[in-house]
Amino acid sequence: MLHMQINLIKKYGAESLFLILLLCLPINDANSSPWATPDDLLAKHDLQMLTDSGLLNIPINTWPIAWGDVAYNLKVENVKDLSPETLLSLQRIKQRLIDEELGGISANAEIKFAKNPDRIMTFFDPVNTKKLAASSASYLSENMAINLKFEKTDSYELLDESYISLARGNYSMTLGSKKNWWGPGWMGSTALSTNARPIKGLSIERNFSDPFQNRYLGLLGNWDLAFILGDIQNAN
């Protein structure tokens, strides 16, 4: 058995075997994460609907967005007054909050193909290479989030979006890399977008966008903060 395992690793590579093993496991639709991430088109649509309808009052232009902030600031008084479209968005977001609250360990695997890959990345996260295989595993608890992701194409192997994050009070500190999207756009952003690889380094973010307690600064309303310190490589 040991001889067979060694031959398999030599033939296919350890990363490929890791991907095959994950494909054989029962997996969730999405990895457990404390944030709604830039590539979740449906979540962006639903959060925009809830914000426009006045049910949610948080900044939604700095992704990733903390699910805890969404849960804390989601205010629904009378469901009967909602339009069918807004009600559907509300139901989907509530279900996402329940799923993310469960936490625990989850795994995911994906294989993508594209005849004509997109050169420009959008919020939809299109395929920018002809072939891509990726596997990821994550762990989520009350104060800790860990994600390990491996991507392989014909030309590169990446560990982007791998991180460990610790929450302390109203702030979380993350070491590694996460996708960022700063701006209201869907097709692109002039600040930060997924068109470049995520920045590897240290990031500090607010978990809840509560307004200032000062009666003057409180007039600014809910606010967010994201600090990123990292090295942007030439390849980006």
What positions do the PLM features span?
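Transmembrane beta-strands of outer-membrane beta-barrel pores
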Residues: 111-117, 141-143, 150-154, 168-170, ...
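Residues on the lipid-exposed face of transmembrane beta-strands in outer-membrane beta-barrel proteins
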Residues: 135-139, 162-168, 175, 202-208
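Short loop/turn motifs that connect adjacent beta-strands in outer-membrane beta-barrel proteins
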Residues: 59-61, 80, 95-106, 140-146, ...
